[in-house]
Each structure stands twice: as C-alpha cells, then as structure tokens.
Design a protein with these regions (language model features):
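Canonical Radical SAM [4Fe-4S] cluster-binding loop centered on the CxxxCxxC motif
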Residues: 1-36
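Short glycine-enriched, charge-decorated loop/helix-capping segments at active-site entrances
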Residues: 26-30, 126-132, 200-208
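Short, amphipathic alpha-helical "lid/cap" segments that border enzyme active or binding sites
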Residues: 38, 42, 167, 171, ...
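Conserved AdoMet/S-adenosylmethionine-binding subsite of the radical SAM
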Residues: 42, 46-50, 54-57, 62, ...
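A structural motif corresponding to the C-terminal lobe/cap of the Radical SAM core domain
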Residues: 181, 197-222
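Radical SAM enzyme core and accessory elements
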Residues: 225-227
Length: 227
C-alpha cells in the first residue's frame, strides 16, 4: 500500500486533518518523532538502495508530508541524484488552490503520488476529517493536468464512506483525471485504536466492524479498483 516494489517509508509529523478512522494519531502534532535533516534521512535510505531493485524506492507519508514541503524538496533532490524512485503519500489538503512554485518543484522531483481521497461529498468530508475537500480535489486535477502519475486510495468504512451514491460520484470525478494508474480500496480496520488509548484520546469509531467482503467488492467494482 506504500507504492510499487520494496519501499523505504518515511513518516512525517503534523497533519491538519482529524480523520475519524486515522490509525496514526500520534503523527497529528509536530511534537512527536525525531528531528532529522534531509541529508540524514537520505543517508539512511542509501543503506538500503540495493534492496529497491527496479521498482522500489522511497515513500514519504505521515501525518501530512506536504506540511513540510521544503524538507520534501531537499530530500527528493538528493534521492533523485541517486536515481531513487520517489513517492508522496498525501491527502492533498495543504495544496494552495492558486498553485505554487514549490509544488511545481516538488512535482519535478516526484515519480508518483498516492492520493488519499477521504470523501467526494463536501459536507461528509468535513464531518469525517474536520476539513473541506476543495484542496484535495483541486490537487488531483493539478496532478492530472501536469501528467503526474497517481494512485487513488480510498478507505472504506461502513456507514461513513460506503454509500453507493457517493462512490459513484467519486468514480465520475476519477473519470475526469488522465493520470490515475490505480485505485486502491482500503477496508477499515481498528488496529490504530490502541494508539488513542495511549494518547488518552477517545476513539470515535470504537466498536465499528470492518466492512463485509461484498461491500468491499462492491466499492472496488464501482471505483474501478484492481484493474
């Protein structure tokens, strides 16, 4: 789920969204983790370069990595100089609707984007994440317009993101994009619940069961996943 081949995954701190199903709540704030320079992270990555083969590489996830775009640009500049495949796992929530020179630079250094679309409907997106979905959808169009490959990822939660109508509206939106290489439907799981307990935070989906197999297959069919 982190991109093609064998991946070295870097988890970044900081995220403006509060997704109800988030399994990494420990990455929401900037106070966790360890401070590293781009050079230090690149040096660690290079130790494993021989394992990447032709398809593997580095995926930067989070949190929301685009909150630290300057770091990403510096890290990917180093990695591309070593011919390492680069990938960003993002919600697109930080994308400035008017575009940015920094984003143009990042796109030139990034081979693939994993774009996590939370919900196609505006009100439902706010209820699910606490944020509007204008920026994520604009970012998807931005990537498509610039011919940048992307994989779409969609978390399926019973009663929250599995409505057939919403899935069909999302499919209609995806059909307007030219560079979607793959759609992944990720069934909800509760493995992150223990992290909320450690953070003394309430887990609002406590008791929510994973979606049934037929609902997963239904979502895959509607969204064109697995093609």
């Amino acid at each position: 789920v982190d991109g093609p081949g064998i991946r070295f995954v870097v988890f970044m701190q900081g995220c403006p969204m509060r997704c109800k199903y988030c399994h990494n709540p420990d990455t929401w704030n900037f106070t966790g983790g360890r401070e590293k320079t781009a050079e230090e992270v690149a040096a660690e990555v290079l130790k494993y370069k021989n394992y990447f083969g032709e398809r593997g590489g580095v995926t930067v996830s989070g949190g929301e990595p685009l909150m630290q775009i300057d770091f990403l640009i510096r890290l990917f500049t180093i990695l591309k100089s070593k011919n390492i495949h680069t990938c960003v796992d993002t919600s697109g929530i930080c994308f400035p609707l008017t575009g940015s020179e920094k984003y143009e630079k990042l796109l030139s250094l990034t081979d693939l984007f994993l774009l996590d679309i939370k919900h196609i409907d505006a009100a439902a997106h706010i209820g699910l994440t606490g944020q509007k979905n204008d920026a994520p959808l604009a970012f998807a169009k931005y990537l498509s317009d610039r011919k940048k490959p992307m994989w779409i990822r969609y978390v399926l939660v019973s009663g929250l993101t599995d409505d057939d109508g919403a899935l069909m509206r999302l499919r209609a939106f995806l059909d307007t994009l030219d560079t979607v290489e793959k759609v992944e439907v990720l069934p909800y799981h509760s493995m992150g619940e223990i992290k909320y307990e450690k953070l003394n935070s309430d887990y609002c989906l406590k008791g929510t069961a994973p979606p049934a197999r037929e609902r997963i297959e239904n979502a895959k069919r509607i969204l064109g996943a697995g093609k």
